[in-house]
From Swiss-Prot:
Its main location: plastid. Active with decylplastoquinone (DPQ) as substrate. Also active with other benzoquinones, which are strongly preferred over naphthoquinones as substrates. This is 15-cis-phytoene desaturase, chloroplastic/chromoplastic. It comes from Oryza sativa subsp. indica. Inhibited by the herbicide norflurazon (NFZ). Optimum pH is 6.0. GO terms for cellular component: chloroplast; chloroplast thylakoid; chromoplast; plastid membrane. Belongs to the carotenoid/retinoid oxidoreductase family. Transmembrane segments: none annotated. Changing Y506F: 5% of the zeta-carotene forming activity of that of the wild-type. Forms 9,15-di-cis-phytofluene and 9,15,9'-tri-cis-zeta-carotene as the sole products normally as does the wild-type. Residues 1-87 form a transit peptide. It is a peripheral membrane protein.
Amino acid sequence: MDTGCLSSMNITGTSQARSFAGQLPTHRCFASSSIQALKSSQHVSFGVKSLVLRNKGKRFRRRLGALQVVCQDFPRPPLENTINFLEAGQLSSFFRNSEQPTKPLQVVIAGAGLAGLSTAKYLADAGHKPILLEARDVLGGKIAAWKDEDGDWYETGLHIFFGAYPNIQNLFGELGINDRLQWKEHSMIFAMPNKPGEFSRFDFPETLPAPLNGIWAILRNNEMLTWPEKVKFALGLLPAMVGGQAYVEAQDGFTVSEWMKKQGVPDRVNDEVFIAMSKALNFINPDELSMQCILIALNRFLQEKHGSKMAFLDGNPPERLCMPIVDHVRSLGGEVRLNSRIQKIELNPDGTVKHFALTDGTQITGDAYVFATPVDILKLLVPQEWKEISYFKKLEKLVGVPVINVHIWFDRKLKNTYDHLLFSRSSLLSVYADMSVTCKEYYDPNRSMLELVFAPAEEWVGRSDTEIIEATMQELAKLFPDEIAADQSKAKILKYHVVKTPRSVYKTIPDCEPCRPLQRSPIEGFYLAGDYTKQKYLASMEGAVLSGKLCAQSVVEDYKMLSRRSLKSLQSEVPVAS
C-alpha cells in the first residue's frame, strides 16, 4: 500500500499563469515527467504540479476557527511477542552483537530511500562506515515529500504502516520513535460504489485471536458479499491455508483473475474485494497482478492478530522517519550526502567495481558497493561487461509501475470521511485519506486535505495535472455526493499538488519471482538492496527495510573476503622499489 517516487529527481522549471477548469486564476510550477528524461539523465523525473488560488491578492493560509474535529488514535498493539517481530529483532541483534571489525569497511551505498537507509543503519550498527549517496536534495526515495511555499507538505504516496511489518516496527523501536506512529482502529473501510456516500466496514474484534478475528470480520460484513459467495471464496482459499508457503509460491504464475477462475471463486469477489486489494498493493488490476502477492498479504493479515491494523506516520516522512535514521548513522561515524548522483559504475580489469563516478566529477571509492536505487535506475547503470550475466539479465523482467499521488486542499471540512484509510473502489482511485484528520502535522480543524492514490496510472501519467484533477473530482463527487461536485459548485479547491511517478515499485506480474535477485551479487564486493530484491514482503516499505538488513548482513558476512580484497588492492598500488 505504498506509493512512491524514484530516488532521483530534479524539480526545476518555470511558472506560468493559467486557469483551472476555465474558472479561477492559478499559479503552476512543474517538472518534466517524460520517460526520455530517465534515459538521458539516469533518473526518472516526475511531475510535481501545484495549484494555488489567490484570494484578494493574499495567498491561502490555514485559519483556525470554532469548528473542532476530534481525532482519536489507538494504543500501539502488542506486537513484541509475535514470531515475525521476534525474528526481525533477532536479525537486528545480529549487527549489534557481531564482532567489531579491527578495520571498518567503507561501504558506498547509492540511494537514500528506505532500502539504502536501512542498509546504512545496520552496517553502522555492525561497526562499519557507510557512505550513503542520494541523487536528490531530499531523503526517502519512494517516501520523499516536499514543503510548498505555504508550509504544507505533499508526498509521493499515501504510506500505511501495518502491524504485519515486523522489520519496520523493530526499526521504529530501535530509533526510539514508536510514538510517531498514529494507530487507527482495527478496521478496513470500503466505499460502496452503488450507494454513493456510503461505506462498508470490516471490523476486527480485539477479543478474538488470529485468524478468527479476520474470519469474524468477513462473516459479519453482509454488504459486499453474500453468504454463498463467502463460502465459495473460503473454499477457494482453502488450499492456501493447508498448503502454506509452498502453495503461495506456486501461484506466482497465475494472475489474480486466472486463479479465481481456476478455484471457482465468483466474479463478484473480484469486483467487491480483489480490485481494491490489487490496486492498493501494487497499483494494478487483478488481471495483471500475480496471485502470490494477494496470498502473501492475506497470509500476513490473517495469521497475525494485529497484522492488518494500520498506522499513519504523524508527519512528513523525510523529517519524521528518514532523519532519525540519518542521525543514527552519523552518530556512529557514517556519512550521508545529498545531491550526489551516480553517472557510472567504473570497473577494475577483473570486472569488479573500481569506484562510483558522480555527475560532478567526483569519484567515490570503498571496500564494498551497494546499489539501493529502484530497479529501473540500476538497469540504466549496469556496466556493459555485466549485462550478459544471468543475475543482471533477469532484471529486464522487473519494471517499475506508474502511479500518481494527488493532494487536494478544500475550502471546508468534509464530513463524509473517517480518521482512517479508505478504499475508494473507484475505477480511477485506489485508497485515500483526509490527512487533516489522520495525521497530526497536517491537522486542520477547518479544512480538509484529501490525499489520494490515482491507480492504475499508466494511461494517465502522461496527461496534464488539470485532466487528472478534473477526473479525480468526478470520482470524489460519487464519494461525497452531498459535499463535492465535479464543477466545484459545492466544496471549492483551494490548491492541489499532483506527484507523478512513472516508475515506482516493481510491477508484481506473474513469473517475476525467479527474476528477483539476491542481495549478494556474483560480482565480489557489489550488492543490491531494494524491495525488488529477494525477500518475503514483495513491493512494500517493509520489503525495502528488510532488503536493506539482508544486504547489510551479506556485507558483514563477507567482511574477511572484502578486507583481503582491499588489502590486495592497496598493495598493488604501492610502487615497487628499484
